[in-house]
From Swiss-Prot:
Organism: Saccharomyces cerevisiae (strain ATCC 204508 / S288c)
Family statement drawn from the similarity comment of this UniProt entry: Belongs to the ATF1 alcohol acetyltransferase family.
The protein, known as: Alcohol O-acetyltransferase 2
Membrane-related topology note: Peripheral membrane protein
Subcellular location, record wording: Lipid droplet; Endoplasmic reticulum membrane
Other notes: Present with 3000 molecules/cell in log phase SD medium.
Length: 535
């Protein structure tokens, strides 16, 4: 029997026994800490379908999707709700360890409007700005739209709503009735990652196809009352919450690897590039502040250009090399060529780069099991520092450049063999840490009021679509806020076989002189890709 004191009436033993409530795992708790300590706002996936859908279609597919993947229908239940925010910032909570994490549960009653940000009063003001900006930009996603959405907070610990919302962007041609083909999946990262966002739209498109091709059984009453989940009615149809991925994959590093980890962490702190402006200091989000604000910039590469990039990688490295190390090399070479960032001092010889990865690849080879982890914050990643001097590659020095690409690829592969891909998150899961430290306090002290350095480069991969189907995902853009994670730069990559590859680039304001200098760098980065990919 679980101890549910402090979580009642939202958590019951019956829910736990049915598999519709459980405690969070260590990795899930990490992202919950970022949110409840106001150190992260959101990440987003922007999607364009090939044609519009109406409200009835959207309600139907959301109902089916949330029943099949209960992770999408869950919320985090904090202690002392509705006074949880004060509790989690109190000395009473922060002064001692809590080895047992909070619960998650399937939401008892969920309506269409609980999922759609357009219809929620607390977001009315920002939604008006978002809709107007999208129309002003000719119904296209731009950096201006991304910068409007980036600071939006999805509150943690609401028993009636999940950790994500869907924005339905206005349509250009409605033919007299409202349809949508442009959407934004917005989440606080709890129970979700970039791959989850891509999967969400892939699954929506498949279900829209199913409705059009085969029809769909539904109750007219459902359409009228707009209820997506009525737990008492639907619980037998709702899948069980999967175990935390940390119960399936051991993130914890061997104790023998800790001396090296702590030594490299010390070097990162004292010998790597750091920002120097007061405006780049990491901070908590608040309604009245401009904390962690960034400039964004979008780059697009057509399917033909992506094929050319892949061909050059294959020619100059080998068949197995992926896009990410090429993008990383171009990014770092362009930073060096900008000649506006690095001081070249003796105490600034490294630049750190984090590459998140999809931890689902380490799950057992069981199709049904893997499918149950389609949604969730199931990430790992490598985090290395590289010599700034190695980015100095003159124009035309192809051999040196492609050697750098191969080196980055090899380091990423090695991180799987030596455990580096999980150690950063795994250290926080060690028993002697969890049992003796308050994780909220530990992370807040480590992340807040710090200068930034380095880049986080995320590539959610290629989404392949069948364009002969009635519905398919035409385009995807992945973006995430800087938060208090101490990175100065962000580079988020997402691709479809229909419209090619999009990159959302971001820099925390104050890292470079102004937006103009940032845009100059982004253009230089684009030119660097063109130079080495022969575009």
């Amino acid at each position: 029997m679980e101890d549910i004191e402090g979580y009642e009436p939202h958590i019951t033993q019956e829910l736990i026994d049915r598999g519709h409530a459980r405690r969070m795992g260590h990795l899930e708790n990490y992202f919950a800490v970022l949110s409840r300590q106001k150190m992260y706002s959101n990440f987003t996936v922007y999607a364009e379908l090939n044609k519009g859908v109406n409200k009835r279609q959207l309600m139907l597919v959301l109902k089916v999707l949330l029943q099949k993947y209960s992770t999408l229908a869950h919320t985090i239940i904090p202690k002392h709700y509705p006074h949880h925010e004060a509790y989690y910032s109190s000395e009473e909570y922060l002064s001692k360890p809590f080895p047992q994490h909070d619960f998650i549960k399937v939401i008892s009653h969920l309506e269409f409007d609980d999922l759609i940000m357009n219809n929620q009063p607390e977001y009315r003001e920002v939604m008006e700005k978002i809709s107007e900006q999208f129309k002003k930009d000719d119904f296209k996603v731009t950096n201006r739209l991304i910068e409007l959405i980036s600071p939006v907070i999805i509150p943690l610990g609401n028993p009636k709503r999940p950790n994500w919302r869907l924005i339905c962007l206005p349509g250009k041609d409605t033919d007299g009735f409202e349809t949508w083909k442009n959407f934004v999946y917005v989440t606080n990262h709890c129970g979700s990652d970039g791959v989850s966002g891509s999967n969400f739209f892939k699954d929506l498109a498949l279900l829209f196809c199913k409705i059009e091709e085969k029809g769909f059984d539904y109750d007219e009453e459902f359409i009228e009352d707009q209820v997506i989940i009525d737990y008492d009615r639907d619980y037998t149809e709702i899948s069980k919450l999967p175990k935390p991925i940390t119960d399936r994959i051991d993130y914890k590093p061997a104790l023998t690897s800790l001396p090296k980890f702590f030594l490299t962490t010390f070097i990162y702190e004292h010998c790597n590039f750091k920002t120097s402006s007061e405006s780049t200091l990491t901070a908590r989000y608040s309604p009245s502040s401009n904390a962690n604000a960034s400039y964004n910039y979008l780059l697009h590469f057509s399917t033909k250009q992506v094929e050319q990039i892949r061909a050059q990688i294959k020619k100059n490295v080998h068949d197995g090399c992926t896009l990410t190390p090429f993008i990383q090399a171009c990014f770092l070479v362009a930073l060096y060529r900008l000649d506006k960032l690095f001081t070249k001092s003796l105490l600034e010889y490294g630049f750190d780069v984090a590459i998140p990865s999809n931890a689902r690849r380490f799950l057992p080879n069981d199709e049904e099991l893997r499918d149950s982890y389609k949604y969730g914050s199931n990430v790992g990643g490598s985090h290395y520092a590289y010599l700034i001097s190695s980015f100095d590659i003159p124009e035309g020095d192809n051999d040196k450049f492609w050697s750098l690409v191969e080196y980055y690829y090899d380091r990423f592969l090695e991180s799987y063999d030596n455990g580096d891909h999980l150690i950063g998150l795994g250290v926080l899961q060690l028993d002697f840490i969890v049992e003796n430290k308050n994780i909220d306090s530990l992370l807040a002290n480590s992340y807040l009021h710090q200068q930034r350095g380095g880049a986080i480069i995320s590539n959610t991969g290629l989404v392949s679509q069948d364009t002969t189907k009635p519905y398919y995902v035409r385009d995807l853009i992945f973006s995430q806020s800087a938060g208090a994670l101490r990175f100065a730069f962000g580079l988020n990559v997402c691709s479809t076989n229909v419209n090619g590859m999009n990159m959302d680039m971001s820099v925390v304001q104050g890292t470079l002189r102004d937006r103009g200098e940032w845009e100059s760098f982004c253009k230089l980065f684009y030119q660097t890709i063109g130079e080495f990919a022969s575009l």
